[in-house]
Amino acid sequence: MSLALSDVKRLSMLAQIDLTDAQSAQTLDKLNGIFALVEQLSAVDTTGVEPLNHPIAALLPDLSLRLRDDVVSEPNRRDDYQQVAPATQDGLYLVPKVIE
């Protein structure tokens, strides 16, 4: 898959980003490079390859990863924070509607 310059200009218009012609061309080259890399990765046969939880484990299988336990380190201060909030309901913060 590759993009054309018209695609980049349309995307920049949708994202409301002003790009010069030079910037559009540079962005086109970068995006097409990314798509080429994704196509290369998609072409690799990964049948039978086990997913890794950490990439270094594949290189150094004897290394024990020093991952800390997932423990709470901060006290629950929701009530304190909600006392100074303008509006709350059932433990949630109420905010003005921003999208119609």
UniProtKB/Swiss-Prot annotation:
Its EC number is 6.3.5.-. One of its GO terms (biological process) is translation. One of its GO terms (molecular function) is asparaginyl-tRNA synthase (glutamine-hydrolyzing) activity. The keyword S-adenosyl-L-methionine does not apply. It catalyses: L-glutamyl-tRNA(Gln) + L-glutamine + ATP + H2O = L-glutaminyl-tRNA(Gln) + L-glutamate + ADP + phosphate + H(+); L-aspartyl-tRNA(Asn) + L-glutamine + ATP + H2O = L-asparaginyl-tRNA(Asn) + L-glutamate + ADP + phosphate + 2 H(+). Keywords: ATP-binding, Ligase, Nucleotide-binding, Protein biosynthesis. It is an enzyme of class 6 (ligase). NCBIfam families: gatC. Belongs to the GatC family. PANTHER family: GLUTAMYL-TRNA(GLN) AMIDOTRANSFERASE SUBUNIT C, MITOCHONDRIAL (PTHR15004:SF0). Allows the formation of correctly charged Asn-tRNA(Asn) or Gln-tRNA(Gln) through the transamidation of misacylated Asp-tRNA(Asn) or Glu-tRNA(Gln) in organisms which lack either or both of asparaginyl-tRNA or glutaminyl-tRNA synthetases. The reaction takes place in the presence of glutamine and ATP through an activated phospho-Asp-tRNA(Asn) or phospho-Glu-tRNA(Gln). Heterotrimer of A, B and C subunits. HAMAP family: GatC. This is Aspartyl/glutamyl-tRNA(Asn/Gln) amidotransferase subunit C. It comes from Herminiimonas arsenicoxydans.
